[in-house]
A protein has these predicted regions:
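Short alpha-helical hairpin
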Residues: 20-21, 37-48, 71
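Beta-rich strand-turn-strand
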Residues: 60, 64-66
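Sec-dependent signal peptide recognition
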Residues: 2-10
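N-terminal signal peptide c-region/cleavage motif recognized by signal peptidases
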Residues: 14-17
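Short N-terminal segments immediately surrounding and downstream of signal-peptide cleavage
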Residues: 21-35
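A structured, mid-to-C-terminal "fold-capping" secondary-structure block
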Residues: 20-23, 124, 129-228
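Membrane interface segments of multi-pass transport proteins and intramembrane proteases
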Residues: 42-59, 161
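Mid-length scaffold segments of soluble, non-membrane domains
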Residues: 69, 76, 82-144
Length: 228
């Protein structure tokens, strides 16, 4: 299977990205960060605020639930790769329920009946496999990441393309934009907190790395820092 082969090749690549300095590329990262900040302040954030204030909450919920159902597909694959069998069965149940009773994912019926949502991506999968995070990096447009997570993001994006390949170009673009806006709306409260920081770059980096620790260890990160 070409996707599995691609994933393992990326895993091999990811193992060479280890570095003791968490922000080895800080100088260049700050340049990209400033670019991303300007792009966000002048484009993404205004769109997100307009969307939140203008679109009925019911409609926003449909977009959010539909995106969440698609995300469950990626989560299921990563849970299997991480040997989280109980979680994978639960996530499969979520997909089944929401894709049928929930009208192709427009309604999150699964959560209402007690099927808890989990989130797993390929970056987390590589962490579970023992791949070091490598240094912190800031990706153009995509934002905070690490060498491991940027590799994981590539896999996640290509898998997203595979899942939506039956859509035409217009439908794919519309779906991508809807998911991007939905994600940005959810980050609006965080934006306010970060902007009040003495150094927004450092605050963003710290917030991202802490959240990734939280995600990788399923909400129970170790007290002492380690290679993750």
């Amino acid at each position: 299977m070409k996707n599995l082969l691609r994933s393992f090749l990326l895993l091999i690549f990811g193992t060479i990205t280890m570095a003791e300095d968490v922000d080895l590329f800080e100088a260049s990262n700050r340049v990209v960060f400033e670019f991303n900040q300007a792009l966000d302040e002048n484009f993404f954030e205004p769109i997100a605020r307009t969307y939140k204030e203008s679109i009925p909450k019911t409609m926003q919920n449909r977009v959010s639930d539909f995106s969440s159902n698609l995300n469950d597909i990626y989560t299921l694959g990563n849970e299997i790769l991480q040997f989280k069998l109980f979680d994978s069965v639960s996530t499969f149940g979520r997909i089944l329920v929401n894709s049928t009773i929930g009208l192709v994912g427009l309604f999150d019926v699964a959560s209402d009946i007690g099927l808890e949502k989990t989130n797993e991506d390929f970056g987390q999968t590589m962490a579970v496999w023992g791949v070091s995070s490598g240094p912190y990096v800031v990706l153009p447009v995509l934002g905070p990441s690490t060498m491991r997570d940027s590799t994981g993001t590539y896999v996640d994006i290509t898998e997203n393309i595979d899942v939506t390949k039956e859509l035409n170009t217009t439908e794919e673009v519309a779906l991508l934009l809807a998911q991007a806006v939905d994600t940005r709306v959810k980050l609006l409260p965080v934006t306010v907190l970060l902007k009040n920081s003495d150094d927004v770059y450092i605050a963003t980096r710290s917030s991202y790395l802490q959240k990734r620790q939280f995600d990788i260890f399923d909400g129970n990160p170790p007290i002492e820092n380690d290679d993750f």
